[in-house]
Amino acid sequence: MQRYRLDAGGLSLTLIMRNGGDTPMPFGFGIHPYFTARRVALHARRLWPPMSAACPRAARSRMCVSCASLTEGCDTYLSQWEGRATLHWDDGRELALRADPAFAHLVVYTAPGADFLCVEPVSNVADAFNLAAAGDARTGMRVLAPGERYSASLRMDFQLGKPGAIRR
C-alpha cells in the first residue's frame, strides 16, 4: 500500500508492506522518481559494484554525486547513505529528499542522452535475494512472517529560487 500527503512544503510518502500469506515472504521496496535536476548532493559510505559490465567500477568512501560524474545509462548503487539528498536545478531550485533508515540503500540513475536523473531510495540493493542467499547480510533484504507488516516513509521538500534555503 502507498500513502501520499501533499502540503504547502512538499510531498510525504509512506510505503506499507504486509504479508497476507501463511509462509514467510522475502521482500524489498523503494520509490523510483525521475527529476529534471542537473545535480544531486548526498553522502554514502558504500558503493556497490555495478550490475552491468559496461559500467565502470569505482570505490569512494564519501561522495557528492553530480550528473557529470555519473556514467550515462548506468545505475550507481549506494548503501549507508545518510537518508538525505539535495537535488539542484540550474535556476536555483532545490528539492530536499529525506528518507527513513529503512531506505538504507540508494540508486542514482542517468539515462543516455536524457535530461533527467533518478534518485531512488530503496530498502535493498539490486540482486539482494541472490546476494543474501550467497551469505551477504548487507543487502537489506527482509523477510516478513505471516501477518507481519513493515512500513517506511520519505519526504520531499521543494524550494524555489534561493539555493540553500531548504530546511534540512
Residues covered by each model-derived region:
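Glycine-rich active-site loops that engage anionic ligands at enzyme catalytic sites
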Residues: 90-130
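Active-site/ligand-binding surface loops and adjacent short beta/alpha elements
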Residues: 24-26, 33-102
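Short Pro-Gly-centered flexible turn/kink motifs
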Residues: 15, 142-160
